């Protein structure tokens, strides 16, 4: 076969959300920190387009690039590439990356528990993997500091009028809205409508509220998280959510950074404290088991350290290639599957 490059990928999903992992064929990008490297990837776009655009990718796909860690405490660094963003952190992608590292032997597995430190762009995370029979069966992530930003803010949204929302950060930035308050249900047959409405709400929140992280230059709201009311059983809170990811899709997983952001809001409202547990349930009924590890301060801002726990499965391996004569070496996007006007 004729090809000008070969990129080695292990395909994976965490509780339904695709998080492929590049394990070879791509050199680490320039940058003194993993954050700097992620900004280079975001600006350059060459790799993003190659792996995310059709015919190799699609709006449903996230791709993670393994890089050598910059912090000596970490065993591996990685950069997350999502359809619209190159974010600081992702819970489902962290679970995919940890699973791939262990299941493929890149990092040696220790049964029954393997502990490691990983370095996404947003800061170090501690990982504990339950392992059995050569498989990482469940990944527990101690996430980056997470915080509520605005509570009960009011914004104007086209087609909805004035709505009340919260904004928060859980490794990425969210606007949170009660699904019923905007006439929506969190159900598979509502996914298209949730995605389209969520992108509109995200745009309005960015225009009218904005966001700025106190310790890095992340300065926009990435996602809209629709929530259903909480229930409680045996002291554990349960809550369904659906996160609309730009340019217009719904996360299949419960969204680890979204669960972290929701717990930060619940903590700010006095509904959760360190040690309390929360189970986030996705639109396809998969779950992340979460809790608040402790309270921290982030450049003067009150924050929490969330814990996210979930499962991932390796579903394949592949080699991405490009023929020198291929007219679509950087891929393409069409609005039938990649919304462009939301």
From Swiss-Prot:
SUPFAM superfamilies in the cross-refs: Diaminopimelate epimerase-like
Assigned keywords, A-Z: Lyase
Binding site for substrate: 91-92, 251, 256-257
Enzyme class per UniProt: lyase
Transmembrane segments: none
Active site positions, chain numbering: 90
Domain of life: Bacteria
Annotated EC: 4.2.1.77
Disulfide cysteine pairs (residue numbers): none
The keyword Transmembrane helix is assigned to this record: no
UniProt GO molecular function: 4-hydroxyproline epimerase activity; trans-L-3-hydroxyproline dehydratase activity
Keyword Cell membrane attached: no
Reactions catalysed: trans-3-hydroxy-L-proline = 1-pyrroline-2-carboxylate + H2O
Database matches in InterPro entries: Pro_racemase_fam
Family: Belongs to the proline racemase family.
Role summary: Catalyzes the dehydration of trans-3-hydroxy-L-proline (t3LHyp) to Delta(1)-pyrroline-2-carboxylate (Pyr2C). Is likely involved in a degradation pathway that converts t3LHyp to L-proline, which would allow P.denitrificans to grow on t3LHyp as a sole carbon source. Displays neither proline racemase activity nor 4-hydroxyproline 2-epimerase activity.
Protein name, as recorded: Trans-3-hydroxy-L-proline dehydratase
Species of provenance: Paracoccus denitrificans (strain Pd 1222)
């Amino acid at each position: 076969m004729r090809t000008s490059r070969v990129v080695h990928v292990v395909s994976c999903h965490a509780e339904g959300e695709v998080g492929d992992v590049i394990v070879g064929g791509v050199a680490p990008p320039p940058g003194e920190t993993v954050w700097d490297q992620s900004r280079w990837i975001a600006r350059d776009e060459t790799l993003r387009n190659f792996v995310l655009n059709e015919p190799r990718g699609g709006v449903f796909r996230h791709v993670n690039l393994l890089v050598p860690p910059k912090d000596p405490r970490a065993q591996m660094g990685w950069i997350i590439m999502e359809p619209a963003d190159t974010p600081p952190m992702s819970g489902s992608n962290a679970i995919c990356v940890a699973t791939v590292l262990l299941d493929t032997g890149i990092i040696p597995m220790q049964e029954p528990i393997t502990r490691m430190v990983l370095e996404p762009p947003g800061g170090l995370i501690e990982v504990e993997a339950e392992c059995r029979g050569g498989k990482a069966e469940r990944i527990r992530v101690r996430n980056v500091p997470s915080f509520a930003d605005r509570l009960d803010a009011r914004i104007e949204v086209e087609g909805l009028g004035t709505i009340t929302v919260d904004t928060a950060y859980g490794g990425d930035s969210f606007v949170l809205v009660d699904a019923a308050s905007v006439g929506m249900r969190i159900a598979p047959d509502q996914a298209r409508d949730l995605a389209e409405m969520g992108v509109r709400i995200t745009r309005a929140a960015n225009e009218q509220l904005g966001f700025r992280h106190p310790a890095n230059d992340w300065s926009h709201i990435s996602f809209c998280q629709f929530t259903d009311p909480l229930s409680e059983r045996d002291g554990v809170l349960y809550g369904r959510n659906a996160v609309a990811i730009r340019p217009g899709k719904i996360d299949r997983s419960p969204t680890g950074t979204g669960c972290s952001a929701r717990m930060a809001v619940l903590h700010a409202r006095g509904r959760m404290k360190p040690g309390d547990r929360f189970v986030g349930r996705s639109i396809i009924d998969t779950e992340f088991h979460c809790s608040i590890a402790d309270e921290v301060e982030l450049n003067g801002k009150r924050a929490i350290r969330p814990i996210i726990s979930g499962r991932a499965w390796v579903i394949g391996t592949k080699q991405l290639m490009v023929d020198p004569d291929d007219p679509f070496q950087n891929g393409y996007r069409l609005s039938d599957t990649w919304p462009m006007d939301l």
